[in-house]
Design a protein with these regions (language model features):
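Boundary at the C-terminal end of the N-terminal hydrophobic targeting segment
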Residues: 15-17, 22-23
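Conserved SGNH/GDSL esterase-like catalytic core that processes O-acyl groups on lipids
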Residues: 25-26, 35-124, 130, 149
Length: 305
């Protein structure tokens, strides 16, 4: 009888854990990678019509654990120092953490330190302590970020054989896993989602494009980049000279990547089935969107186990 009751309790807990979430207040303390993750999240929630959310993003481009903590100390010393914005208003980190009764607060490393956990402390510990002090009701999650494009310049040069996108993925994953275990904080599988989609997608990305002249590019031509989830090459106008510059971003998610990230966060936090989500960004085809949603659903389900 005891065994039966135990099994019933376990089954009930599992069933409750898998119930769709109808409403959530979620704050990210991050950088451009949390901006990528949030880009389409609100629209996905709205278009699916099965949940509501309050989303906050205390983000500064290139912001590490250390910088977030330093910004907080500056705000303590000078209350006028408010480096973040929420609903159009300047905010300190204290302001942000107390602006809503957040259900979830996510934290993450800056990407170029994501595989260097020796640079995270004591700043990550300090931020976690601050969250627990100012938002004790919130559950802390670790945002496991992604590896750069395989053709990112960071992987080339004299040490090119010692580092790669594969190694960045593996090493950052190990570092985030250790942080997750330290704080008993679940890990959001953004890195897994982008990596899995890149490996399994039917259209494989080929970079560099053998037909493109990278040394003598002509505006507005761009290399073929089908299957990319991270931006790659683009043209940018110099505000001073008004000349077009051939530019490379091997770090940030493109529209496909941002849609995949949004779907992953939605499936992970709201436990929603994406089969009947009919919305996607204009530059993502319905067929591709279906594939990306399937990856998001699977990766989110695996991470929630």
């Amino acid at each position: 009888m005891k065994k039966l009751l135990t099994l019933i309790v376990i089954f009930c807990i599992a069933a409750i854990a898998d119930e769709p979430v109808a409403a959530l207040k979620l704050l990210s303390i991050g950088n451009s990678f949390s901006v990528n993750a949030h880009k389409y999240l609100g629209e996905i929630i709205k278009q699916h019509g099965k949940a509501t959310a309050v989303l906050g993003n205390a983000a500064i481009g290139g912001c590490s654990f250390k910088r977030h903590w330093d910004e907080h100390l500056k705000s303590v010393a000078d209350p006028a120092h408010k480096p973040y914005r929420y609903k159009g208003k300047p905010m300190s980190l204290r302001d942000y953490l107390t602006a809503e009764k957040w259900d979830v607060v996510t934290i993450q490393s800056v990407s170029h330190q994501s595989y260097k956990p020796e640079l995270w402390q004591p700043y990550a510990d300090n931020l976690v302590a601050l969250i627990k002090e100012l938002a004790p009701q919130a559950k802390i999650y670790i945002h496991r970020t992604w590896a750069y494009r395989p053709d990112n310049f960071r992987f080339f040069g004299p040490k090119k054989n010692k580092f790669s996108a594969q190694l960045m993925y593996e090493q950052s994953g190990a570092a985030y896993k250790a942080l997750s275990e330290k704080y008993n904080a679940p890990m959001i599988p953004s890195g897994e989602a982008l990596w899995t989609a890149f490996q399994e997608q039917p259209v494989k990305n080929v970079s560099p494009d053998p037909a493109f002249d990278y040394k003598n590019p002509v505006h507005p031509n761009l290399p073929k980049d089908d299957g990319a989830l991270i931006k790659g090459y683009y043209w940018k106008k110099d505000p001073k000279t008004q000349e077009w510059k051939f530019t490379f971003d091997g770090i940030h998610a493109n529209s496909r990547g941002e849609y995949l990230l949004g779907c992953t966060w939605y499936a992970y936090f709201f436990k929603q089935n994406l089969d009947d989500l009919a919305w996607q960004p204009k530059d993502v085809t319905p067929e591709d969107a279906k594939f990306l949603r399937s990856i998001a659903q699977r990766v989110a389900a695996q991470a929630a186990k």
